[in-house]
A protein has these predicted regions:
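ATPase catalytic-site recognition across NTP-hydrolyzing enzymes
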Residues: 1-38
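Short, structured patches in soluble enzyme cores that scaffold and shape functional sites
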Residues: 2, 13-14, 50, 62-64
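Short, well-ordered loop/turn elements at secondary-structure boundaries
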Residues: 28-30, 40-43, 96-98, 142
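A conserved active-site cap/scaffold subdomain adjacent to cofactor or substrate pockets
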Residues: 30-49, 58-64
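Mg2+-dependent endonuclease catalytic cores in nucleic-acid-processing enzymes, primarily RNase H-like
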Residues: 47, 54-184, 203-204, 213-243
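Short helix-capping/linker segments at secondary-structure and domain boundaries
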Residues: 199-208
Length: 243
């Protein structure tokens, strides 16, 4: 696609080969994220991923796309659960883990229904300063801070083709792909990515303190020396006690 002054994420065309990957290695420890842009007439798109703390990258592993009569609360919850169990799998624990955070746009009724009926908790994202939030996504794309698995066809198509409307307040309606396999709509997958970038906690370290220590039945671990308290440090200083 041709990049114009109205292209929402122009950096993607230059970085696509580095961003879109066919294989993803999941870290031993990670914070999982789920982001949802809700549409009933438009598409509902849910993104699944994790923040790779060691490499400082947001990794999108899968997507879920629904709309029309199939878009019921029960069906949405069922499919989200299936994707979470498949994609948010901790190899260290050999089991799926609950996401650190689920977020969606401000559909408070759906948020309440998912929590009440399915024990599935979403936080409502802020949606102000949209252009500033898009600029943040552009920077992350430019810096290679986002990885997307190639199975996320709608997300890739929407990022690549999204165009601003004349007021730069929203996106122009996007035609479906030539084969009809990928729905265009209002680039809802891009909105879900914007929510994700806005809400990811880059500062949180998901690794336990003893992650790099040797473990096993034949490994002896000496007791950890307790750190001196501030009071003890002061006494040691006064008494000129050397450690």
């Amino acid at each position: 696609p041709r990049t114009t002054e109205n292209t929402v994420i122009p950096e993607f065309s230059l970085m696509k080969d580095k961003i879109v990957v066919d294989e993803i290695e999941t870290p031993h420890h990670f914070d999982g994220y789920v982001s949802c842009d809700v549409g009933f007439r438009d598409l509902t798109v849910v993104l699944f991923g994790f923040y790779d703390f060691m490499n400082a990258q947001l990794v999108i592993t899968d997507e879920l796309v629904m709309n029309g009569p199939e878009m019921t609360t029960d069906e949405l919850a069922k499919r989200i659960k299936q994707k979470e169990e498949l994609r948010l799998f901790n190899t260290e624990l050999n089991m799926p883990v609950a996401p650190y955070l689920r977020i969606m746009d401000n559909d408070l009724k759906l948020i309440n229904d998912l929590a009440r009926l399915h024990n599935m908790y979403f936080a409502a994202t802020k949606k102000d300063n949209k252009e500033a939030q898009i600029n943040q996504v552009r920077l992350w794309v430019q810096q290679g801070k986002i990885k997307i698995h190639e199975r996320c066809k709608h997300l890739i198509y929407h990022i690549e083709n999204a165009q601003w409307d004349k007021n730069r307040k929203g996106f122009l309606h996007l035609k479906d792909s030539l084969t009809g396999e990928i729905r265009g709509g209002h680039c809802d997958a891009l909105d879900a990515l914007i929510y994700l970038v806005r809400n990811v906690n880059e500062a949180r370290n998901p690794f336990p303190e003893d992650f790099n220590e040797m473990k096993g039945p034949n490994v002896f671990k000496s007791p950890t020396k307790r750190k001196d308290s501030k009071l003890q440090e002061l006494v040691n200083t006064i008494m000129n006690i050397k450690k």
